[in-house]
Amino acid sequence: MNNSTRLISLFSPHPPPLFLLRGLYISRIANLRRFHRRAFPPSSVASTNLCSFRPLVSLPPLIPTFPIGRFYNHQVRVSAADFVPSYHNQQLPEWTELLQSLSKAGYFSDSGSISGLESEFFPGFPDELLRPALACLALARERPELLEMLSRRDVEVLVENGKPFLFKTGPDSLKRMSLYLRSGLQGIGKLMDMEKASTVDLMRLILSYVVDVASSEESKQHNKEIMESSVRSLLSQIAKMSLRPPESNVHDTMQNQYSDRDGQGVRSFQNNVEMKRGDWICSRCSGMNFARNVKCFQCDEARPKRQLTGSEWECPQCDFYNYGRNVACLRCDCKRPRDSSLNSANSDYSSDPELERRLVENEKKAQRWLSKVAQGGSDANSVDTDEDFPEIMPLRKGVNRYVVSTRKPPLERRLANTENRVATDGNSKRSDDNALGSKTTRSLNEILGSSSSLTSRSDDKNVSSRRFESSQGINTDFVPFVPLPSDMFAKKPKEETQIGLIDNIQVDGFSGGNQNVYQEDKSDANHSGKETDRLEKEDHKSEEPARWFKRVTELHNVSDLESAIPQEISPEKMPMRKGENRFVVSRKKDRSLTSPAYKRPEDSDFVPFVPFPPDYFAKEKQPKESIDTLPAPATENVSQVVQQEPREPSINKSDTVAVKIRNGKSLEGSLVKESDLLDMSEEAKAERWFKRVAEIKNISELSEIPDEDFPSIMPMRKGVNRFVVSKRKTPLERRLTSQRHQRNPHITNSDPTGKGDK
């Protein structure tokens, strides 16, 4: 049949030129736009500038597929099964992909699915676009669930910027889509069937945008890039979903699962789909999600809250379902929120009628209690009875939430009642005496000027003592709690004053007032005497440093200050003077039993350390030796005078060392012992080292000291840095130095003044 078709096309007359078809296509699109602008307001028009158009698809492949008999003298009948679209669009490659997917799914070959849809378009719709548009609308009618499965963000961009100008019911579709986006998830179930948006409404917007982009060279929209990316994303998603089998039954059942008004219980939406415990259905796209999903995997909708029953609670961190007895989450160890515990408690006790009755009674008691307290003062115990006192303390504005009841327990209230009865009986018998005594004490207090605070304290103590006496009379085993006085652990003057006050309280009449005054005078005298003694001691201590400084200035030239200054004048703590060091060590002798002098035995071999004399190492007092030197020529300048090195024969070197040792300053009369040459201790080495260093005149003589006498640790001397680095050469260096010295002996001047012999 293909061969016959080719032969017929060869013998048939040629079709009209391409520009004629393009002109016809452009004229029809322009007529549709003009009709759309006249029928609807200008705001619903997608694009007003239609100066130039471009064909949506390549026209030659569409020529043999549509009824275009008006362009041919002979009609060619091509079956629908042989139709294979080959559309190419450079701007929207996803549109070509969608048409190929529809062709594979059989929407172009099924004429029954697209029949009756031609009436949706405006009259004069191009025949070249009719069949692809009908195939897209057929897909939208068969797959109504695609609207919920597409990206909501892309749909919002298309609805805000797109205009369905190709269809008669375009404004209605745009209205339904806008209402769908505004209503959200909660308003979908409340809308009527006529107001609900469908996939067909979305497809009308997509087709109008595709035709608009293909027919205009340059789009005048300000958000062209956002609009194009959203439409391409929607076309790609629809092309992929069109190849999948339809799931209309699943969609219908999932739409009905939330038909209950309260939303309790989940019905089985499909018999062949098994849902496990914890799985949930998305209320937006009706997609089934696993229990671990926090949001829907299709539309990114948040997981709905569970309908909790009883004391169960949901973890706020990991959304894990916990029982009421769980204090912490079993999955993430998160602590149970406080709101859930309150809700569970309210749900448990809300059905108890007895509890409700008691709460109502407590509220009434609380109102009566508050009114009585406001009228009777702050003493609630005397105002209220047990019947009027509320079980739960009411909360008032500005009061702490957790109020602790100050109400006494029943036992204490009974004891207080018996005390009051005993007190009233005693007061009736002694009313006259008490009245007379109170008048006398008031008059004395006014005369003597005693403070009212002491009287109030005495009254409180008398009342407490009466209560304790009455309680002891009722119960012999009762031991009252007597608090300690506030000044019990204070100083003695205060204790004596308190004793005087207590004696004054116990004695009635004028004699008690006189005794109180006497005790106060006595305590004041004792306090003033002790204060005087303390001031004298402080003055004596402050005078000691002054006397010590005066004595030191008088004995400024005395070398031994410790023996010259008596012990009584020397203070225990050295005073501080301006400009001196803060940490001053006292010169006072330590005569305690723990001193080192006391611990040292008398028959020990202790040898005290005696420092060298200050002029022991002075070179000026050393005996001068005659050294032969060559005088410099007198005609030369002073700057050109070069002192010749002294010439000393190497044979007399040992004799010179012996003379130095014999002529050295004697230490006779000091406590320094003669060192033992066989002693290899560090102290002996240090002692021998100091002796030899004092005798050395030339640095080259250090090599003559044997290694045994050289100390491993350099000794410390006064005025020398603590961290002394040894300048001793290694044995190899000493050998090299000695050979070099033998070849070319180096003689230096040992005279410290540099004047030489005169």
Swiss-Prot record:
- Tissue specificity comment: Weakly expressed in leaves and roots.
* Location of region: 3 X approximate repeat: 122-502
GO BP terms in the entry: chloroplast mRNA modification; chloroplast organization; mRNA processing
Zinc finger regions, RanBP2-type: 276-305, 308-338
| UniProt GO MF annotations | mRNA binding; zinc ion binding
**GO CC annotation:** chloroplast; chloroplast stroma
- Repeats (sequence): which ranges? 368-415, 547-596, 688-736
Keywords for this protein: Chloroplast, Metal-binding, mRNA processing, Plastid, Repeat, Transit peptide, Zinc, Zinc-finger
Query: Disruption effect?
Result: Defects result in variegated plants that have leaves consisting of normal green and also white or yellow sectors in which chloroplast development is retarded or disrupted. Mutant plants exhibit severe editing defects in chloroplastic transcripts.
Q: Where in the cell is it found?
A: Plastid, Chloroplast
Per the record, where are the segments of Basic and acidic residues compositional bias? 457-469, 519-545, 572-581
Gene3D superfamilies for the chain = Zinc finger, RanBP2-type
| Summary of the function given for this chain in its UniProt record | Probable component of some protein complex required for chloroplast and palisade cell development. Involved in C-to-U editing of chloroplastic RNA. Controls a large number of chloroplastic editing sites. Binds the editing recognition trans-factors PCMP-H51/CRR28 and PCMP-H12/OTP82.
Listed name of the protein: Zinc finger protein VAR3, chloroplastic
Q: Which organism is it from?
A: Arabidopsis thaliana
Q: What is the lineage of its organism?
A: Eukaryota, Viridiplantae, Streptophyta, Embryophyta, Tracheophyta
What is this protein's gene name? VAR3
